[in-house]
Amino acid sequence: MTLFKVYARALRYLGAYKLRVSLVVVANIVLATITIAEPILFGRIIDAISGKGEVKPILFMWATFAVFNTIAFVLVAREADRLAHGRRATLLTEAFGRIISMPLGWHHQRGTSNALHTLLRACETLFGLWLEFMRNHLSTVIALALLIPTAMSMDLRLSAVLMVLAIAYWLIGRVVMSRTKDGQASVENHYHTVFSHVSDSISNVSVLHSYNRIEAETRALKSFADRLLEAQYPVLDWWAIASALNRMASTIAMMVVLIIGTMLVQAGQLRVGDVIAFIGFANLLIGRLDLMRQFATQIFEARSKLEEFYALEDSVREREEPAGNGEIKDVKGAIEFRDVSFGFGNSSQGLHNVSFSVKAGQTVAIVGPTGAGKTTLVNLLQRVYDAQGGKILVDGTDITKVTRKSLRRHIATVFQDAGLLNRSISDNIRLGREGASEEEMRRAAEAAAAADFIETREDRYDTHVGERGNKLSGGERQRIAIARAILKDAPILVLDEATSALDVETEARVKAAIDNLRQNRTTFIIAHRLSTVREADMVLFLDDGRVVEQGSFDELSHSNGRFAALLRASGILTDEEVRKAHTTEAA
């Protein structure tokens, strides 16, 4: 993407404020016009004084311009700041909404810290571009567009010097940008590495403390920062050279204007005021060209950040759901997988030709070794990912034909990690159903066996749970998560290792709450603790993404298959029980 396209797309975000931006454009035209007029007026005053002419009309005109200049400047300063700040806040909100609504598979592939870093840096970069566009870029472009024709109308010879100076600035900038393009892209990659390392370390700070990794991780960060500087310094060196060359060209141009102007005045071909005006033009041109150089540098440095953000936005729009998808309503909970397959790119993990059906209100236990595809299966049900083959039906409706939002409205999930927000207990429970009353929220807490410990807290339901619920115990966090699911009152329930991280006593309390939650709901239970799946109507044993055994708990436990082997390994079933079961069946 060229610099012009990067900049043009950045400015398109201001399209929502066309009227206000138009006012800023008009004000900048006024500022640029007055900027060009001032050197001419100053030259006329010099001529009037030296020729003993009338000065007052020129001074009055200058004073009038000063009034308009002040008004236009205040308008630009006020509106530019308000527009830039307002658009940044709006963009952050809009982009956040689009990004967070993306399928979890998209987030897993891209990485949370990467998307966050890209969004935040782009918002700040765009804010700077918008502010500079309205404060300086626009007036600079207009001033340059007016300056050259005005100067040429006064004297072509001195105008040629200004033209050569402008071309020199352009050539220097062009060369430097071509030499630093790859270097600046490398700098942005190093910034991402530094940010990801900091984010990763802070989010796992307890592990770093436990394994005495603080100093090692700090050294690693310093190493990443050193590499960043190694990539940054050559870019800075090139721009320093450009500044020196521009300054040299400006000085030479100013000297040439003075020399040629003096010769023309002595020859009687120009007035002193004209030379003064051209000196003002030269100073103005140098100042504006410096602004243009800074402007080009700003866009050049922003290029990699914005290209990544544009790619992020485009990928979000590509993954947005078709506008024609309808809503699924009045779900009873009958679910069918028809020859469903899904894969993770180059990974061998996934699902292969999975088929089964569940009646509304039944409980399905999904078991199998690590990496068998258990979580992938329930993720497909919730459209975290979309199946690459086959169909998933809810009450006979293909879930790819309905919106994710309407589908998930009918599914409540309790994860192994409760996933609490750094808000109050009440706020976390109310995530289950927006607009739930205080009474409904408290009833859900009671049903989840959470009310007792909540009432012992000083602030009760207003107690803040801390980051990811770190002010609560594991059992307390899980009971709040269960209360959230109860409040949602969805016909389909997913329990993803909901009790695996709890001790036996806490698990017993949480299991009672889960049993209450499961009533009259189609339930999927993922569990490594096989004792939790005894009451399942159906057990699916997955291995390598395939359903290798399927049936009731009793059927599979007496089949002497993979599931029975797991039961024996966990001590739930003995070899003697299996032998007796087979003897009974044979008889």
From Swiss-Prot:
Cited SMART domains: AAA (SM00382)
Originating organism: Rhizobium johnstonii (strain DSM 114642 / LMG 32736 / 3841) (Rhizobium leguminosarum bv. viciae)
Annotated protein name in UniProt: Beta-(1-->2)glucan export ATP-binding/permease protein NdvA
Ranges of residues in domain ABC transmembrane type-1: 21-301
Positions of transmembrane segments: 23-43, 57-77, 128-148, 158-178, 248-268, 272-292
GO molecular function: ABC-type beta-glucan transporter activity; ABC-type oligopeptide transporter activity; ATP binding; ATP hydrolysis activity
Compartments, record wording: Cell inner membrane
Enzyme class at the top of the EC tree: translocase
Matching CDD domains: ABC_6TM_NdvA_beta-glucan_exporter_like, ABCC_Glucan_exporter_like
UniProt function note: Involved in beta-(1-->2)glucan export. Transmembrane domains (TMD) form a pore in the inner membrane and the ATP-binding domain (NBD) is responsible for energy generation.
Pfam families: ABC_membrane, ABC_tran
